[in-house]
């Protein structure tokens, strides 16, 4: 069985550097990744097309600059983009296709697949390759996710899947979710992990063994919070288990070394807040804003994460961090 690898280094990795990757960094990594045989190289603001903003962070480059830079660097791999309806629009998708995007992935909250209907339909009308993912998948049951996936396929998605956005799932949770989806839809299934509880590689293997055919990851795990699935670990493990990735290991190890040298300020690690984020079920990308607001207010950041988890906060609601910090400070005084 062939497993397609979606390399999210230049998109999810943006979270780790506050969306400040430069054109030179994008070009350097994309060129290296293109030599590996990886199927898709994903690029953009960490939150996707149209997301560069005060609320979730201004990117160093515009979407146009990011996409054109990477497009020029790819000869073999497809270029992928990610978009969340509400941040991105049909106008953003139009531009992305004009800049040479090969694969568009639309993301929604795990119970809000209907938000992707218009965008997926439009993409299919354009003849574009359209995928869709359900985010924060720990917040929905396997049956609910399968129903949502069926809706996405009905809207035109040619591959569907789930993101463990908070790094909260364990292998048995992944197996149950992918198995339920596999029984209900016939298109390829996608899995995207975060490593808050140290489960990213194990969860990705569980997804593949349950029937997923497209797996996300990043060189050196470079991504939000505790990072993503570390591709240079996952790839040889998949091959050892008898799955084909089509990726040259030495070339990918070289790309990962380059990423460590040129893209990262500090390598991803599972620190105390990463663990708390995973346990609380809060999006990994909240780490920096929680630290900033909690630190300035003298509030324990761990308490902030658990309260955000209790409220079931999702990506895009970063403004509520300020509210939670203020309430915790008042309660302590």
Curated annotation (Swiss-Prot):
Give the reactions, separated by semicolons, that this protein catalyses. Answer: (S)-4-hydroxy-2-oxopentanoate = acetaldehyde + pyruvate
> Quick check: keyword Manganese in the entry?
yes
The record places the site described as Transition state stabilizer at: 11
**Catalytic residue positions:** 15 (proton acceptor)
Record-linked InterPro entries? 2-IPM_HCS-like, 4OH_2_O-val_aldolase, Aldolase_TIM, DmpG_comm, DRE_TIM_HOA, PYR_CT
Q: Mind telling me which Pfam families this protein's record contains?
A: DmpG_comm, HMGL-like
Boundaries of every Pyruvate carboxyltransferase domain copy: 3-253
Q: Identify the residues that bind substrate.
A: 11-12, 165, 192
Source organism's superkingdom? Bacteria
Q: Mind listing the GO molecular function terms for this protein?
A: 2-isopropylmalate synthase activity; 4-hydroxy-2-oxovalerate aldolase activity; manganese ion binding
EC number(s) in its UniProt entry? Answer: 4.1.3.39
Q: Name one GO biological process term.
A: 3-phenylpropionate catabolic process
The residues listed in the UniProt record as binding Mn(2+), with positions renumbered to this chain, are 12, 192, 194
Keyword terms, alphabetized: Aromatic hydrocarbons catabolism, Lyase, Manganese, Metal-binding
What pathway or pathways are given for this protein in its record? Aromatic compound metabolism; 3-phenylpropanoate degradation
Q: Return the SUPFAM superfamilies for the record.
A: Aldolase (SSF51569), post-HMGL domain-like (SSF89000)
Q: Which HAMAP family match?
A: HOA (MF_01656)
Tell me which family the UniProt entry assigns to this protein.
Answer: Belongs to the 4-hydroxy-2-oxovalerate aldolase family.
What does the UniProt record say this protein does? Catalyzes the retro-aldol cleavage of 4-hydroxy-2-oxopentanoate to pyruvate and acetaldehyde. Is involved in the meta-cleavage pathway for the degradation of aromatic compounds.
Assembly and interactions?
Answer: Interacts with MhpF.
Can you say what this protein is called? 4-hydroxy-2-oxovalerate aldolase
Identify the taxonomic lineage of the organism of origin: Bacteria, Pseudomonadati, Pseudomonadota, Gammaproteobacteria, Enterobacterales
């Amino acid at each position: 069985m062939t497993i397609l690898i979606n390399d999210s280094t230049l998109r999810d990795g943006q979270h780790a550097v506050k969306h400040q990757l430069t054109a030179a960094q994008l070009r350097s990594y994309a060129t290296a990744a293109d030599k590996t045989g990886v199927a898709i190289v994903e690029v953009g603001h960490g939150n996707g097309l149209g997301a560069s903003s005060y609320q979730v962070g201004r990117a160093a480059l515009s979407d146009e600059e990011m996409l054109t830079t990477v497009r020029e660097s790819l000869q073999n791999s497809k270029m992928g983009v990610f978009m969340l309806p509400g941040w991105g629009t049909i106008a953003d998708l139009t531009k992305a296709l004009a800049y040479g995007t090969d694969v568009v992935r639309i993301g929604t909250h795990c119970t809000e697949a209907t938000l992707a209907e218009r965008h997926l339909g439009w993409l299919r009308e354009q003849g574009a390759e359209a995928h869709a993912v359900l985010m924060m998948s720990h917040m929905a049951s396997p049956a609910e996710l399968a129903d949502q996936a069926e809706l996405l396929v009905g809207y035109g998605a040619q591959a569907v899947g789930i993101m463990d956005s908070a790094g909260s799932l364990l292998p048995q949770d992944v197996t149950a979710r992918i198995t339920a989806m596999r029984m209900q839809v016939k298109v390829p299934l996608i899995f995207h992990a975060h490593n808050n509880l140290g489960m990213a590689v194990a969860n990705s293997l569980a997804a593949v063994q349950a029937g997923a055919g497209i797996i996300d990851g990043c060189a050196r795990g470079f991504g939000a919070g505790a990072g993503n699935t570390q591709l240079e670990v996952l790839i040889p493990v998949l091959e050892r288990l008898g799955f084909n990735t089509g990726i040259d290991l030495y070339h990918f190890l070289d790309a990962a070394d380059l990423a460590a040298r040129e893209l990262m300020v500090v390598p991803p690690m599972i620190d105390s807040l990463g663990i708390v984020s995973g346990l609380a079920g809060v999006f990994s990308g909240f780490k920096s804003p929680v630290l900033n607001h909690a630190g300035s207010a003298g509030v324990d950041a761990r308490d902030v994460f658990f309260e955000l988890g209790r409220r079931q906060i999702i990506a895009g609601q970063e403004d509520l961090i300020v509210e939670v910090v203020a309430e915790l400070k008042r309660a302590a005084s």
